[in-house]
Design a protein with these regions (language model features):
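Beta-strand residues in well-ordered beta-sheet regions across diverse protein folds
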Residues: 14, 70-72, 83, 105
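Beta-strand-rich modules
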Residues: 13-35, 104-127, 131
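Extracellular low-complexity, O-glycosylation-prone stalks/linkers
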Residues: 1, 25, 74-93, 116
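Pro/Thr/Ser/Gly-rich low-complexity, intrinsically disordered linker/stalk tracts
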Residues: 18, 34-76, 109, 124-142
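Conserved strand-loop elements at the edges of beta-sheets that form or border functional pockets
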Residues: 5, 15, 62, 96, ...
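Low-complexity/repetitive intrinsically disordered segments
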Residues: 1-17
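Short beta-strand segments within Ig-like beta-sandwich modules, predominantly Fibronectin type-III
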Residues: 2-7, 93-99
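Short strand-edge motifs at loop-to-beta-strand transitions and within beta-strands
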Residues: 9-11, 100-103
Length: 142
């Protein structure tokens, strides 16, 4: 069905399904002399599941005995999952927060600590829907 209209080159579907694929066709239009829209063809479609956008401005700063992570809020996120690893360690879950920052008090002073931050929200069924991460950051505890 109809999703929305915009004069811009992007559109955010706030009602996208998170448990199934959403299909989108974009139709260009011009206004006719009579004031009616003349709709063009849509040569292709795209599809995706509804998730939160990646966090932006992810940064790591060394602190005494810790590494402090900060980022800009992801639209519609209820919280953030923090994953990481040291140079020689295994990738895994570190913690979660509803804020736009996290302090890893178990960060290594000897090795680089690598961090990924994933935004999430809970759908109507209470299921956690996890978004993507755009990049990673790294730091060492002082």
């Amino acid at each position: 069905g109809y999703c929305g209209m915009t004069s811009k080159t992007s559109f955010v579907d706030k009602k996208a399904l998170d448990n199934d694929y959403n299909f989108y066709w974009v139709y260009p239009y011009v206004m006719g002399a009579d004031g009616n829209r003349i709709v063009g063809k849509s040569p292709a479609y795209v599809y995706a599941k509804g998730i939160c956008a990646s966090v932006t401005n992810l940064k790591a700063a060394s602190q005494n005995g810790a590494v402090k992570l900060t980022w800009t809020k992801s639209a519609d996120a209820e919280g953030y999952l923090i994953y990481g690893k040291t140079e020689s360690g295994k990738y895994g879950y570190i913690g979660m927060t509803s804020k736009t920052g996290y302090i890893d008090k178990k960060a290594s002073k000897k090795e680089w600590n690598f961090y990924w931050v994933f935004p999430y929200y809970k759908n109507a069924d209470g299921k956690m829907i996890v978004g993507q991460t755009g990049k990673y950051v790294y730091g060492k505890a002082k």
